[in-house]
Amino acid sequence: MARHAIFSALCVLGLVAAALPQFATAATASDDELMSRIRNSDFFDGQAPVDSLRPTNAGVDSKGTDDHLTTSMDKASVESQLPRREPLETEPDEQEEVHFRKRGVRSDAEVTDDNIYEEHTDRKVVPRKSEGKRSFKDLLKKLALPAVGMGASYFAADRLVPELTEEQQRGDEPLTTGQNVGTVLGFAALAAAAAFLGMGLTRTYRHFSPRKNRSRQPALEQEVPESGEDGEDARQ
């Protein structure tokens, strides 16, 4: 404790000794020298302080009334007295909404339901219930040719292939020329029936598989932010 007290006393004495020359100079100096030192110091940032003790005639007209007060104040103090503009408080959930409208189209408020439906009057709307029937009819039309061709080829092969006797089946008796030609035509008809069957399966698969949209989509119209300016200003 004694060491701390001695250290504190020495610090206080050092501060007093350092401040004594300043007090002595201030006591011996005149008023003019004191004011000049204060003006030259950096305390007022190069601005002259207000001398309330000395009367001045600045700002006094011939009638003896003060026209305006001539006081030099610090810039920081002047700014502190000015009214501050507080920023507008906005809720965090509120976001700025930007409305877009197509070029050449009126605003959303002016567009009515009649205008919307007028654009689609030329289109033929098919109910959902008839879509299945139409799809089934299309499938039947696609499978008509393969079905007829396969049936005709099968019956032709059945008629063209000759009936062999027991000796011909065992190989004891050779086939005649007509039987050989009929056998060849019969196998050709069977091949045609198989081809028609493959055609029908292919058309069925293509009918139920997802189709690729090969038609080109129309170019999207450029969206322009809705504002009070004209369309030409928006293009620029």
Curated annotation (Swiss-Prot):
A cellular-component GO term for this protein: membrane
Biased composition (Acidic residues): 223-236
Keyword annotations of the record: Cytoplasm, Cytoplasmic vesicle, Glycoprotein, Host cytoplasm, Membrane, Secreted, Signal, Transmembrane, Transmembrane helix
Membrane topology: Single-pass membrane protein
Gene Ontology terms describing biological process: symbiont-mediated generation of symbiont replication vacuole
Chain positions covered by the region annotation Disordered: 45-106, 208-236
Transmembrane segments: 181-201
Main location as per UniProt: secreted
Residue numbers spanned by region Required for dimerization, interactions with liposomes and liposome tubulation: 147-236
Disulfide bridge partners, by residue number: none
Reported phenotype of the disruption mutant: Gene knockout has no significant effects on parasite growth rates in cell culture. Reduced parasite growth in nutrient-depleted media with increased vacuolization and loss of organelles. Increased frequency of parasitophorous vacuoles loaded with mouse immunity-related GTPases (IRGs). Reduced levels of mouse IRGA6/IIGP1 phosphorylation following Toxoplasma gondii infection. Reduced virulence in mice. Significantly reduced virulence in mice in double knockout with ROP18.
Entry's localization field: Secreted; Parasitophorous vacuole lumen; Parasitophorous vacuole membrane; Cytoplasm
Other facts: Mice immunized against the protein produce specific antibodies, show predominant Th1-type immune profile in response to vaccination and survive longer after Toxoplasma challenge.
Family from the record: Belongs to the Gra7 family.
Function: Binds lipid bilayers, sequesters host endocytic organelles in the parasitophorous vacuole space, and causes their deformation and remodeling. Plays a role in nutrient acquisition from the host. In complex with ROP18, targets immunity-related GTPases (IRGs) to prevent IRG-mediated parasite killing by mouse cells. Important component within a kinase complex, contributing to phosphorylation of mouse IRGA6/IIGP1, an immunity-related GTPase that protects mice from infection by certain intracellular pathogens, by Toxoplasma gondii ROP5 and ROP18.
Quaternary organization: Homodimer. Can form higher order homooligomers in a lipid-stimulated manner. Component of a complex at least composed of ROP18, GRA7 and ROP2. Interacts with ROP5. Interacts with ROP18 in the absence of ROP5. Interacts with mouse IRGA6/IIGP1 in GTP-dependent manner; the interaction results in faster turnover of the GTP-activated IRGA6/IIGP1 oligomer. Interacts with mouse TRAF6 (via N-terminal RING domain); the interaction plays a role in GRA7-induced pro-inflammatory cytokine production in mouse macrophages.
Record protein name field: Dense granule protein 7
Species for this entry: Toxoplasma gondii
Gene: GRA7
